[in-house]
Structures are given as C-alpha cells and as structure tokens.
Amino acid sequence: MSDKQVTTILFDLDGTLINTNELIIASFLHTLEHYYPSKYKREDVLAFIGPSLFDTFSSMDPDKCEDMIAMYRAYNHDMHDSLVTEYETVYETLDALKKAGFTLGIVTTKLRDTVNMGLKLTGIGEFFETVVTLDDVTNAKPDPEPVLLALKQLGSEPAEAIMVGDNYHDVLAGKNAGTKTAGVAWTIKGPEMLAKHEPDFMLEKMSDLLQIVGVK
C-alpha cells in the first residue's frame, strides 16, 4: 500500500527507533524496589512504558513523585549505554528516507539529555531535522501538542505527515493532530494492544515504511 502524499515522518524514540525496554524496566524496578520493597515484578511495570514518569509515579504517591522521578532518571542515565540498542533496519530505513527527500523528526516523552545520549549511541541523530522532547511542551502525548510543534518546526502540515510509534500514546497523538499513524509490531506490549487503537499502518520491521511512502 503506497501513499505518496506523505512528505514528513515523525518517530517516537524509545521502543520505536531504539530498544530501551530493558533500560526502562530496570529503572522502574530499581526505583520501585526502593520505595515499595518486593511489591513490583517485571510484568507489573510493563504498563508504565509509554506514559510520562509524572503520570506513573504521581498515581502511586503524589508526595514522593519528584523523588521517585529523580531516582529513576539517575539510574537510567548511569545504565543507559550498557542497556540500549538499535532496532533492526532502523538505520538503513532512515538513511533511505533522508536520501529520498523526506523530512524526518522525533517526538518523544523523554528529556533532551537522555534523548541525545540515545541518538549519539546509535548514530541516528544526523537524520532528524527536529527533535521535540518533554522539555519543549506543556502536554505530553497523547495530547497533539508535541506532534503539532514538530510539524510547525518542520514547516509541514498534518495531512502530509505520518506518526510512527510503539505505544497507543503515539497513535492517539498522531490521530489527535490529524496525521496518518503507523504502529510497530515489535512493541513490548504486543501488536494486538496497538491494533486496538487502529493505526493506519502496522510495521513488522522499520523498512516496511519504505513501501508505504513509495520509496523503492
């Protein structure tokens, strides 16, 4: 299925372009073990992947939320380079899209310092003309604000853009902003979860995106 109207492609970062799942899970378990010893296991924290840290920790204890976020981020920063990898066909796909003249951006719920660490580690930062992080917005995904900000910075309209992500927050943010949407089947929560939110496309691997936008 080809759609040649797309000129701009926005990507989520964690779980979409780079595999930070083990880092995120380890960071949650480290933090929660400190505040709630023996209460949370690996399977319990999967639901926390996607929402902002504030949303997750404030729902547990509003008074300790900022302290929990600080502990999470410190551990996440320290362990970043040893636990983060790049997904299959990501680099090659971004390279092909860039050479074909597409405008590329990142829309993430992470802070800029850890975003930059991931881009540097994997070498994919060169492909993106804008990177919208949690630092840049008032409302995180699924609110359309970060998607609309990225499009504004790129000089693109929602109708010519596609938002790619591994979480329902990404799909809903794209829909709320008026873009097309693509889910990734390698989401840790399973493609069935993502399919419930009816993305326009589902990618089995990142290179599937090339056919969708008409790159040979």
UniProtKB/Swiss-Prot annotation:
UniProt keyword list: Hydrolase, Magnesium
Source domain of life: Bacteria
GO CC annotation terms, alphabetical: cytosol
GO terms for biological process, alphabetical: DNA repair
Enzyme Commission number(s) from the entry: 3.6.1.1
Active site: 12
GO molecular function, one term: magnesium ion binding
HAMAP family: Pyrophosphat_PpaX
Name of the protein in its database record: Pyrophosphatase PpaX
Native source species: Bacillus subtilis (strain 168)
